[in-house]
């Protein structure tokens, strides 16, 4: 089930954010994610976030900022079970177009977004990490 993020969800959602980023981005030092943990928690409280619950446990979430996808995050043990797709489809139902940034070294995420209809528009550089990324977009047809 997908529902709107509630304030009480913050610890579980922030933990999923941290764990997922460390595992998915092994080319970025874990300390980078840990050092941003507190500010991300604060930002999540103000953001448009939808959580996916299974058996009353939050297993994933998606963050939106207008048409920008801040991220799709699924807890490690629940990955590759369609939860990311469900969350992304939920966002697609709410927007006519979406865009996001994804690290070029994150081949798994790039493949996922391509399967879901996103296209690479151009490449750039994440100045905070020094890593190259892609801007990908999706548009309702």
Residue ranges and their predicted role:
Residues 1-15:
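A short beta-loop-alpha structural element at the N-terminal edge
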Residues 80-93, 111, 115:
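Conserved acetyl-CoA-binding loop-helix of GNAT-fold acetyltransferases
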Residues 114-123:
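Conserved acetyl-CoA-binding loop of GNAT-fold acetyltransferases
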Residues 93-105:
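Conserved GNAT acetyl-CoA-binding A-motif
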Residues 39-51, 68:
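A short helix-loop-beta-strand connector motif used in the catalytic cores of GNAT acetyltransferases and
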Residues 68-79, 102-103:
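A short, internal acetyl-CoA/4′-phosphopantetheine-binding micro-motif in the GNAT/acyltransferase core
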Residues 15-41:
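Conserved GNAT-fold acetyl-CoA-binding loop/helix
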Residues 48-60:
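Conserved beta-hairpin
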């Amino acid at each position: 089930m997908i529902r709107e993020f509630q304030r009480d969800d913050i610890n579980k959602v922030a933990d999923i954010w941290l764990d997922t980023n460390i595992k998915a981005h092994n080319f970025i030092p874990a300390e980078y994610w840990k050092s941003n943990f507190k500010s991300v928690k604060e930002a999540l409280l103000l953001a448009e976030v939808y959580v996916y619950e299974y058996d009353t446990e939050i297993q994933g979430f998606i963050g939106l900022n207008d048409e920008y996808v801040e991220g799709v995050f699924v807890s490690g043990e629940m990955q590759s079970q369609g939860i990311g797709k469900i969350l992304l489809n939920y966002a697609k139902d709410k927007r006519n177009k979406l865009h996001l940034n994804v690290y070029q070294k994150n081949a798994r995420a790039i493949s996922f977004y391509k399967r879901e209809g996103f296209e690479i528009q151009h490449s750039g550089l994440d100045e905070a990490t020094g890593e190259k990324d892609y801007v990908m977009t999706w548009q309702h047809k």
